């Protein structure tokens, strides 16, 4: 799974949903997306040539996969039957230092993709948040 926002290590949802299930974590980059600032979380909008999202590829233990996926689906508001869902879960190729890896990634669903939001400068949510006024 590729994570680029609040599910990254050190971010609010890492400990809640991924830390105990993670088997391995490496840095990764997802090309062809524009990362948007949705307030307390980002959304990756698929736009070929638009830029990239900086994040992490997380390998999840097989015995924890289904429960972890269900928890993240819930967090991301992903329900394929809901036309107003916040995110879509799609399989995409993510670049890592060891080469490309096919990963599940949550990209902006119909509701978020059509909204007017500011872009996350540089495509790195963690760095972007650290640069905001009042960041510690």
Provide a role label for each language-model segment.
Residues 1-136:
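Glycine-aromatic micro-motifs
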